[in-house]
């Protein structure tokens, strides 16, 4: 008799739910019902999946607070993704990791700038030394005759009798 009563009760609950769903779906204002139902389904699945996970994590881990915080942040991030948001919740640990990464990259870039600055200073010093060596020589000491290959050419003062041998002379010819 009890089984029959349970069966009747179960059938009446199912009938009541079916009637309720049919009346809700017939109402034109409930156009968003499938979306609401899918969100509720996801929330229920997350609830059912997270409770055993949390129990196991709390029993097996030494730092239960971090695990609980990580699980809650993960659940909220999942809900935000389902809602279509691109932003995520981050914990202080993740922010500290990102800050450490940024600081490390800045240090690396500062070292690179320091190396480049040192190299540039060395190049400037080298150019200064080259310039100083070039400026020490005066033009009076440089013998240009070697450069233009004119060692045997005489100047006007060195010519005999001060006459230019290349000037044309009067030539008389017999006819």
Swiss-Prot record:
Spans traversing the lipid bilayer: 29-51
Any Pfam family hit: Rota_NSP4
Segments in the Lumenal topological domain: 1-28
Binding site for Ca(2+): 120, 123
SUPFAM superfamilies: Rotavirus nonstructural proteins (SSF58030)
Intracellular or extracellular location(s): Host rough endoplasmic reticulum membrane; Host membrane, Host caveola; Secreted
A GO MF label: toxin activity
InterPro entries reported for this sequence: Rotavirus_NSP4
A GO cellular component annotation in the UniProt record: extracellular region
GO biological process per UniProt: monoatomic ion transmembrane transport; symbiont-mediated activation of host autophagy; viral process
Keyword Glycoprotein applies: yes
Post-translational modification: The N-glycosyl content is primarily Man(9)GlcNAc, with a small amount of Man(8)GlcNAc.
Oligomeric form and interacting partners: Homotetramer. Interacts with the immature particle in the viroplasm. Interacts with host CAV1, early and late in infection. Interacts with host integrin ITGA1/ITGB1 heterodimer. Interacts with host integrin ITGA2/ITGB1 heterodimer. Interaction with microtubules blocks trafficking to the Golgi apparatus.
Main function: Plays an essential role in the virus replication cycle by acting as a viroporin. Creates a pore in the host endoplasmic reticulum and as a consequence releases Ca(2+) in the cytoplasm of infected cell. In turn, high levels of cytoplasmic calcium trigger membrane trafficking and transport of viral ER-associated proteins to viroplasms, sites of viral genome replication and immature particle assembly.
Record's protein name: Non-structural glycoprotein 4
């Amino acid at each position: 008799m009890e089984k029959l009563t349970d069966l009747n009760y179960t059938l009446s609950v199912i009938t009541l739910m079916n009637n309720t769903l049919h009346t809700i779906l017939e109402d034109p204002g409930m156009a968003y019902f499938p979306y609401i139902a899918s969100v509720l389904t996801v929330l229920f699945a997350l609830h059912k999946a997270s409770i055993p996970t949390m129990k196991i994590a709390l029993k097996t881990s030494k730092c239960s607070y971090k695990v609980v915080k990580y699980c809650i942040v993960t659940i909220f991030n999942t809900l935000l993704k389902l809602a279509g948001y691109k932003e995520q919740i981050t914990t202080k640990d993740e922010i500290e990791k990102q800050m450490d990464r940024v600081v490390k990259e800045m240090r690396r870039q500062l070292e690179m700038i320091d190396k480049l600055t040192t190299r540039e200073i060395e190049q400037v010093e080298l150019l200064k030394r080259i310039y100083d060596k070039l400026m020490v020589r005066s033009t009076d000491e440089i013998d240009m005759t070697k450069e233009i290959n004119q060692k045997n050419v005489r100047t006007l003062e060195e010519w005999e009798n001060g006459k230019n041998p290349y000037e044309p002379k009067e030539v008389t010819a017999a006819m």
